[in-house]
């Protein structure tokens, strides 16, 4: 593999045995592609804005004299960029402008004659835009729209598993689900009649819907039944024989062939052998006794030719009298329905008997009564209702997906078709459910991923937008029908508010629009790749059963079987697998390599769950020879959801990668294959809660996906084009672009501005640091700057800690963790948290609130950190209770008259009229002020601090833009200088020419002169662009802010809190091995090895066997080897060994392992590159052990040997307190530990007295309410069991809800008297009141 200059700084040793056929696709594409489809112009009109507009427009007036047509749309540019929106607390959005055409028709002239056309561009609200990282900024906060997994539109056949009826009989049903519109259900009842429901209302006989579709009884029987024909003879009947139909029946007469030979005797069962004999003898007719027809069902109406009387009606059971009547009337042939108990039931015939309607109108009225009970039905209303239910494009849409699924399920070859139902569709569904009831077809599996599809951001936003348009449509239609249209323009017809409201509601408060989890880069990526079955149109937590939540065979390679939350949402919220993507229909697809005749090709096909069922698919770990031929005779593979073994020739596809089945979070766990699934689930989930540490530390034992994840998450700065680093400082990186990658007429400079100390959604710190130096060469895709939790472009969520598995004086009982003081001293787990505190000055009824340093009844010392405007200084160190922003609120009983207001304004406020409502630091917080922002309403005078901040921002903006301009200008001048040198000028001449005149020189060569003129033009453009950018920036900074009604001023103070690790903090490894720190032990007391190196963390060995997460033990061994090799390299550097020896050792390390795919050609590295690599490997060589394809035990032992460590992975340890050796050897090594965002500082609080609940008068609960510890009923039992009566009495009275008792107690304590007199608990009074409310009078007798 070829490594770039920056990748050579540190190379991860990869133990993967399989070649990388396909790179992991861009991880955020599910979000970005979906939204791009929504906002991009689509000439076909099948998706996005175009589809929404075309589905609603043109809007015609009721009279048809005018219509409003849609022409085109365009999205404008956003006013503020993403960062400005976050600071100002506004939505990052762009205005949508739509060109509409109003056409007026001439009433007097011929129909369709146009009288007038007006075209205008109309504003239709702001549409939130997606940032380049797949998020939305709504009201200043970053949000993610989670994709939804919902039931695909189409037709589904199912049964109730025998749960509905007491007999346990299985009842089948069919359901047609449209994308929008009414659901249509068909279901059998226990008596095998077929019923229909519309929108889950009461059921009707299924034949009613067929009658409403204008089918007669005769038509219905013709559709659903084959016929058996009889000829009437004198004493018998002759039946037309279809031999196959007799199978399984018991002969009620002797069955003879043409020659009269008896084939089946009376009373015998007819078998397949008998049928073959009948077919052989070419018997086409069979004479049967007259009574054979009794009970058969007539297939049509039989009418007396003379009188016109109906002798036998269709669907009537035949009797001997009926036969006699027909014989008398001269009817020679009878047709009956072919019904067979085994595989041709009389279901529709029975249904017709239940049906009380006889014609179409009656059926329509019946449907109208069911849909609109209580309304008198009329013919027109009934017809219109039925038409609108399933046959109107406005009200009903199966969608492209629905039609495809519908047609495929019913065996129709064409995937295309209309979005509405046809008569044939409904009949086909009824025929299919009858086929299933007859046992000739299977029901569907609704948890199959071929029946569930993904609805992503773009599609959901489009649906919401359409909802808004439909609301507008009603209003427009009314306005078109009213008023004088000659005066109106399209602008006057459209009200954009409903559209904005629908879109805003979706992005702001939909269940699927979620506050982004921004703990670390991984949590961001996983949140964007989350797939939820909840939400509008989805499941609900309470009603979702076990089957829906379970892992389904079709999840393979599409949804991760590991990563899902614990708790009520388990299985309902899933994560997209690493390689999965959605197809044009919204179904999940996963890639497979094509296999032809047992040879694996490099062709990769994406298959959906529907297609996958047709193929035989082998795993990625199949042994192949050098030509890609499968070596084993029998190969483990999957076919139709089952695992089986097949020969190489039968295999059609093979997995792309062993990590294909799991999500990115799960594939970050090394040795995942050795962990129990439950613990792996916890491990995947807990990595998302890791807090970015002060100094990121790459994992020594990784999986090789760390780099991909860090780059795709968007937290690191990635080079857009190649070149070299021209300038670098803490806040910006300048890259001079390669000549080959330049666009014509540009300066060839890329400037990357870094994000510094910004607050994330979870109050963690986002900070970018350059990881390149001036002069470094850069290629496209190189990481230029690290973000939070990244180290040289690798994801680094935690720290590599030296751990030992051993008990230590009970301090690691029950998963507790003992850590060394050195960990805290070295700031290994120190994190920075940034809190935003806001102070809002409002306009109240009593006057305006004011932000000032003049606060009543506050001493000088409390104001020491405020400036004269009453706002805290940047850099001030504050603690709980300190004032951050001084604010006074007017208080008073009466409202002020205008005269009083004027007098107050002239003579100043009286102190007594205002109360202190300053913003103070919350009690348990201590930190440093890192930023202050002041937002002032337009028209309100800015205070001194606001003006200072504004000037500072303007200065900063000017400085940034000037530097940017100078860099670009330098690039232009540099190129001009090179051009002039090539045209014959020499260095001395050029030095003599002033820089400003360089571009105006004249050259003889015409081509070069043109090039110079282009550079001069470019310079002028840059200058103009600089002036324009600065003006825009300055205007944005100085303009007033658009604040909420009644708000005059907002001051936001940003407080940085540094948190070191301490007892009570939660830590975890990557294998679900979590625990709480019990003690921070002095370094000298920690166990140490023979070399005197102390252990950092001691874990309990009992946490491993029962939990079966052995991966952590292997990680510790491999970590020890990686660190040991790093130590050896460090020693070589320190001893200044020969470079050849160093190169040889590093080469040996990278070449270790069997069949390892990675090839690192250390020989091709320059000496400098080898030294730089060695320096970066001093702390340990990073290794990659991919899931299901990782390092083997043998390789770990080889690594240990190479590091000069015992291959057992265990060593002698000595007690730090006594110096004694421990009884047996201990597993010691390096484990990657995470500090989780469950910090004791955020959880611990104490209360003596505080607020009480109004009704029960008991203390509130929780830190936010400053509540108490609940003493529940189980704790009461404990005190009862101990017989601690006085303690119990105290708990239930004065410490809880005895109002008088607790007040007296408080007074007594103040007086130094520790007596208590318990009274009546308030909750007893509440109980009395509740009993009285039931109408039972209860009195308390206090004698």
From Swiss-Prot:
Its EC number is 2.7.7.6. One of its GO terms (cellular component) is DNA-directed RNA polymerase complex. GO terms for molecular function: DNA binding; DNA-directed RNA polymerase activity; ribonucleoside binding. PROSITE patterns: RNA_POL_BETA. CDD domains: RNA_pol_B_RPB2 (cd00653). It catalyses: RNA(n) + a ribonucleoside 5'-triphosphate = RNA(n+1) + diphosphate. InterPro entries: DNA-dir_RNA_pol_bsu_external_1 (IPR019462), DNA-dir_RNA_pol_su2 (IPR015712), DNA-dir_RNAP_su2_dom (IPR007120), DNA-dir_RNAP_su2_hyb_sf (IPR037033), RNA_pol_bsu_bac (IPR010243), RNA_pol_bsu_CS (IPR007121), RNA_pol_bsu_protrusion (IPR007644), RNA_pol_Rpb2_2 (IPR007642). The keyword Kinase does not apply. The keyword Transcription applies. Pfam families: RNA_pol_Rpb2_1, RNA_pol_Rpb2_2, RNA_pol_Rpb2_3, RNA_pol_Rpb2_45, RNA_pol_Rpb2_6, RNA_pol_Rpb2_7. Gene3D superfamilies: 2.40.50.100, 2.40.50.150, 3.90.1100.10, DNA-directed RNA polymerase, subunit 2, domain 6, RNA polymerase alpha subunit dimerisation domain, RNA polymerase Rpb2, domain 2. GO terms for biological process: DNA-templated transcription. The RNAP catalytic core consists of 2 alpha, 1 beta, 1 beta' and 1 omega subunit. When a sigma factor is associated with the core the holoenzyme is formed, which can initiate transcription. Belongs to the RNA polymerase beta chain family. This is DNA-directed RNA polymerase subunit beta.
